[in-house]
């Protein structure tokens, strides 16, 4: 039997849920208004992937900050060491899935945000050399 989603936040214009969380993998669901920055530039020691369900997400990926905008059905996998940031694009809300493999503490970090508790997890500032290039990322504009 599949686990039930762990709803962390649900308001009129935003939502966040943990769908799967174990050491090997976490999958989270998010919904945010359009035109909103979600994260600034950072790197992980693990892979992070995004699948757009609705709306658009705008990414900056790699040492050069290559801009990529993906609509519904779009997918990007960002390998370990590749700098990235993203947000919702346009004026429409967006819904998407985020996959961390391995989890790297992301699910605990999300729970900590809700509880107002700082939780350390696998995230770091972009290194001085900018990290690895965007060519390492896997981008599928639409499935």
Predicted regions and their residues:
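A hydrophobic/aromatic-rich effector-binding and dimerization subdomain
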Residues: 99-123
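Short, conserved beta-strand element in jelly-roll/cupin
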Residues: 30-32, 43-59, 99-101
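Short histidine-centered beta-strand/loop micro-motifs
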Residues: 18-20, 38-44, 61, 68-69, ...
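A short, N-terminal "cap"/entry segment at the start of jelly-roll beta-barrel domains
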Residues: 1-28, 33, 39-40, 114-143
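Short acidic-glycine-tyrosine-enriched beta hairpin
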Residues: 64-80
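Ligand-binding loop in jelly-roll beta-barrel domains
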Residues: 72, 80-107
